[in-house]
Regions:
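Short coil turns that delineate tetratricopeptide repeat
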Residues: 9, 43-46, 80
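Alpha-helical solenoid repeat scaffolds, predominantly canonical TPR units
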Residues: 34-37, 71
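Canonical positions in the second alpha-helix
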Residues: 3-4, 38-41, 75
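TPR alpha-solenoid repeat register
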Residues: 14, 48-51, 85
Length: 99
């Protein structure tokens, strides 16, 4: 029997591929729905780097900031594609300071 984490990550990867196809075919509502589901699945594995990368990617696709500052140090150790997420954190902090 496969580990539940492996099953979740296989589902996340498959859902991400499907969302990319929907984005390419301009079916944005369906792509957004898949990205929301990816974020929910990734929330089950908050300390896993791969899940964090997929969550950040999906949040970027949804134009939502990454709000958990607890793992900002983990973000700094991720690949360069996650720099957009760091900019989203900065944007969120700036907006919060003006409130």
């Amino acid at each position: 029997m496969q580990d539940k984490n492996n099953i979740d990550f296989e589902n996340i990867m498959r859902m991400n591929e499907i969302a990319e196809v929907y984005e390419l075919t301009k079916q944005n509502k369906k792509a957004e729905n898949y990205h929301r589901n990816i974020v929910k699945l990734c929330d089950r594995h908050p300390k896993n780097e791969t899940a964090l990368q997929y969550k950040i990617h999906s949040l970027n696709q949804l134009n939502k900031p990454y709000k958990s500052l607890e793992t900002t140090n983990e973000l700094l150790n991720l690949n360069p594609n996650s720099l957009i997420a760091l900019f989203n954190i900065i944007k969120f902090l700036k907006e919060a300071s003006y409130v």
